[in-house]
Amino acid sequence: MTSENNPLRHTALFPSTTAVERWAIPGLILAFVMFYLLPLMSHGLWIPDETRYGQISQEMLLSGNWVAPHFMGIRYFEKPIAGYWMIAIGQAIFGDNLFGVRIASALSTGVSVWLTYLLARRLWNNPRINAASALLYMSFGLIAGQAGYANLDPQFTLWVNLSMVAVWFAIDNRTPRARLGGWALLGVACGMGLMTKGFLALLLPVLIALPYMLWQRRFGELVRYGLVAVVVCALVSLPWVLAVHYREPDFWRFFFWHEHIRRFAAGDDAQHARPWWFYLPLLFASTLPWALLLPSTLLRMWREKREAKMAYLALWFLLPLAFFSLSSGKLPTYIMPCLLPVALLMGQTVVKWLDQRSGRFLRLNGVFNTVLASVALVALLYLQATKEIYENTEMFSLSLAYIVVVGWIIANALQVLRPLTLWAMPALGIGLLVALLPAAMPAQIVNSKMPDQFIAEHQRELSETASLLSNDLGAASALAWRLKRPQVDLFNTIGELKYGLEDPAMEARKVTMDGVGQWMTEARKKGAVGVVLRVNSTQEEQEVELLPVDGKHYRRGNLHIFIFAQKQP
């Protein structure tokens, strides 16, 4: 009898299989609501990602153009359409607010947690492993942190996860009908992944399934049933693929070469260029607060690699990680699709330790996390005493920061004291962190990284203006989102809108330092003018000096808001 099927009951976290089956799913749902959903409205939109994706999706609702993405009315072809659809649907249902912008990321992560639970049940049919794997995945630092952040990575990760779960269900089923269902589901996931972030959604399932099926000597089955996935993927994605080509013939050329070829093969000139080993230390950080369990988990994976399900999980983890490491362009969130198999492997490892009543590695994990948080607490006390990073008016935010750090220490200390009965307590620590830390940010970070909060305080005055101007894409998109007005002209900045601004029709949207005086004169003839500037450099200070001196001026940190009244000729 294997240890995972051992009927031995002991006073671990899961006192009985029946209790796990009864409480695991309600407990995961409760944690999802408390740590993922409730904090969504507790802090402003981070720049540049959240304001960008919130504005692009809102613009779909305002313009009715659900085919070609536009950023503040300017062509923006760096991503396909489906991710914007989901964020737009969130805003359509819940309103143009923080919850509406972020709900797509939270729900995508929640579904990925559910997929973890389902696949664990399929692999081992052990309620304790099911619950442990889902809890671990839900509490990985990178996964939990992105769940409340409005970008496309949680959505893309969902579609990759669904693809790989569908492949396993397809190849593990005995009946042709069930296999067809699995391959068809793979096609749906690939089609949605393609429309969320591109051709990587098609590559990753092939990268994993092909060597696995060759190893299993089932290549013919892969070819026969794989055609079903190809057809379904085409049915899902082809209508939009053709529609965007018809409306914007240059979309696929730009998207393919800029977002795929350049990122993978451009070397040091690639966007977000990083060394090949970038993801190795990041993998450790991404799995906090469970990072010290990672070596033992991977060692067990290697020892059991000849077992079919372990080999599949190993390929799912290792091959995408190797592919992303070879790519020239790298961002931390790219490895999110690698983490679900890690959670499954780690969940099985933890339950085996509990069955064997071996808490050594769990205790070491708690010690590491406790020391880490203790260092963070000392650093916070020192910085507050010497630098006063929180002002006297920010005691509530400072209190939240202390709650986060002390809560992390207590949660992990409990794991140290009772590693078998309270092994899951680090999940509570990471839950407190992702729920409270964004709201605990000092004002200097809020003012710098969440400009929509300051803009919201002056929203009435800004909404009464006829023209808008900004020197920063993050501030401009926050302004456009808050006012529901995509038309924000760009003062001495281009950034990621370089491609869209090359359109001759967009020439009027670019305002140079030499031309801002004339632009202001013409704009004030039409009505009041609102200007939002971020001032971090000497050049940006010069931009402020070029503005008229007769306007209202509001300042918070490096963010400046000017309101200029209409001026008749």
From Swiss-Prot:
The protein's annotated pathway: Lipopolysaccharide metabolism; 4-amino-4-deoxy-beta-L-arabinose-lipid A biosynthesis
Gene it is expressed from: arnT1
Name the record gives this protein: Undecaprenyl phosphate-alpha-4-amino-4-deoxy-L-arabinose arabinosyl transferase 1
Record field: transmembrane: 27-47, 98-120, 129-149, 151-171, 194-214, 225-245, 275-295, 311-331, 334-354, 366-386, 396-416, 420-440
EC number: 2.4.2.43
A single GO molecular function term of this UniProt record: 4-amino-4-deoxy-L-arabinose transferase activity
Membrane topology of this protein: Multi-pass membrane protein
Main location: membrane
UniProt keyword annotation of Cell membrane present: yes
Cell membrane recorded as keyword: yes
Organism annotation: Pseudomonas fluorescens (strain Pf0-1)
Family: Belongs to the glycosyltransferase 83 family.
Location(s) in or outside the cell: Cell inner membrane
This protein's GO CC annotations: plasma membrane
Role summary: Catalyzes the transfer of the L-Ara4N moiety of the glycolipid undecaprenyl phosphate-alpha-L-Ara4N to lipid A. The modified arabinose is attached to lipid A and is required for resistance to polymyxin and cationic antimicrobial peptides.
Keywords assigned by UniProt, alphabetized: Cell inner membrane, Cell membrane, Glycosyltransferase, Lipid A biosynthesis, Lipid biosynthesis, Lipid metabolism, Lipopolysaccharide biosynthesis, Membrane, Transferase, Transmembrane, Transmembrane helix
Top-level taxonomy: Bacteria, Pseudomonadati, Pseudomonadota, Gammaproteobacteria, Pseudomonadales
UniProt catalytic activity: 4-amino-4-deoxy-alpha-L-arabinopyranosyl di-trans,octa-cis-undecaprenyl phosphate + lipid IVA = lipid IIA + di-trans,octa-cis-undecaprenyl phosphate
GO biological process, alphabetically ordered: lipid A biosynthetic process; lipopolysaccharide biosynthetic process; protein O-linked glycosylation; response to iron(III) ion
